[in-house]
Amino acid sequence: MAKQVENNNNDHLVQSTDPEHPSNLIPELCRKFYNWGWVTGTGGGTSIRRDDHIFIAPSGVQKELMKPENIFVLQFPTPKYPPSERKYIRKPLDLKPSACTPLFLAAFERGAGCCIHTHSQWAVLVTLLVEREKGPGGYFEISNIEQIKGIPRGKGKGMLGFFDTLRIPIIENTAFEEDLTGSLEKAMEENPDTCAVLVRRHGIYVWGDNVAKAKTQCESLDYLFQLAVEMHKLGIPWVKE
């Protein structure tokens, strides 16, 4: 079993005056996401990879109240399963690791530098609309909207254009967060250029090369989801023929 090093040995990993340090960025991002309505009721999560360390927001902490000392740190790479084998090198004694951990690891194993999980209402709504209109295997698709240009075509392939069709895969929710890992990885394998996966009736996972890219992609997607819901109300198709 991997040795679990408790927090009082490695507090230095989350102590920094640098505002760009992951232990400072994660609480700041969580406060923003809370204010935007993305992570209410302690839901959602954020994780950042810096070199061979992964910094992860804990489970059960109100996002607007999160502090650097609440952050978990993992050695990377690390096993996803079983949880007891994960290489924690900084583990707050009074908190639980995020249930999103194996899903974040799936993104990091594919080269991401940051992964964001939100419970955005707009993300949830578009998964329901797609299910109603296209069935359980449908994708979220939208075209001819300026904000699509904020989403990458794929790693190293530049950004989507105005006339391109954005396609985001949707997976089914499960009773426990960690049980989403297999279907998330399958969606990643089948859609290697995607930077996001929607979870029906739940939310979305978005990842990027770094914090700025993951954040701006998440913002662009949420804008597009809200716009899509409003377009649907007006009878305007998401994909222009």
Swiss-Prot record:
EC numbers for this chain: 4.2.1.109
Q: Does the keyword Iron apply?
A: no
How and how many cofactors are bound, per the record note? Binds 1 zinc ion per subunit.
Catalytic activity reads:
5-(methylsulfanyl)-D-ribulose 1-phosphate = 5-methylsulfanyl-2,3-dioxopentyl phosphate + H2O
- Report the locations given in the UniProt record: Cytoplasm
Source organism, top-level taxon: Eukaryota
Q: Which InterPro entries match?
A: Aldolase_II/adducin_N, Aldolase_II/adducin_N_sf, MethylthioRu-1-P_deHdtase_MtnB, Salvage_MtnB_euk
Q: Which GO terms describe its biological process?
A: L-methionine salvage from methylthioadenosine
Pfam families to which the protein is assigned, alphabetical = Aldolase_II (PF00596)
Q: Which gene encodes it?
A: mde1
Q: Where is this region: Disordered?
A: 1-21
Listed SMART domains:
Aldolase_II (SM01007)
Q: So what does this one do?
A: Catalyzes the dehydration of methylthioribulose-1-phosphate (MTRu-1-P) into 2,3-diketo-5-methylthiopentyl-1-phosphate (DK-MTP-1-P).
- Quick one: which pathway? Amino-acid biosynthesis; L-methionine biosynthesis via salvage pathway; L-methionine from S-methyl-5-thio-alpha-D-ribose 1-phosphate: step 2/6
Species the sequence originates in: Aspergillus oryzae (strain ATCC 42149 / RIB 40) (Yellow koji mold)
Give the record's family classification.
Belongs to the aldolase class II family. MtnB subfamily.
Single GO cellular component annotation?
A: cytoplasm
Question: Under which name does UniProt file this protein?
Answer: Methylthioribulose-1-phosphate dehydratase
**Which cofactors, by name?**
Zn(2+)
Which keywords does UniProt give here? Answer: Amino-acid biosynthesis, Cytoplasm, Lyase, Metal-binding, Methionine biosynthesis, Zinc
Q: What is its main location?
A: cytoplasm
Residue positions annotated to bind substrate are: C100
Q: Where is the composition biased (Polar residues)?
A: 1-17
- Provide the binding site for Zn(2+): H117, H119, H202
Q: What class of enzyme is it?
A: lyase
GO molecular function terms listed in the Swiss-Prot or TrEMBL record: methylthioribulose 1-phosphate dehydratase activity; zinc ion binding
* Residues at the catalytic site: E146
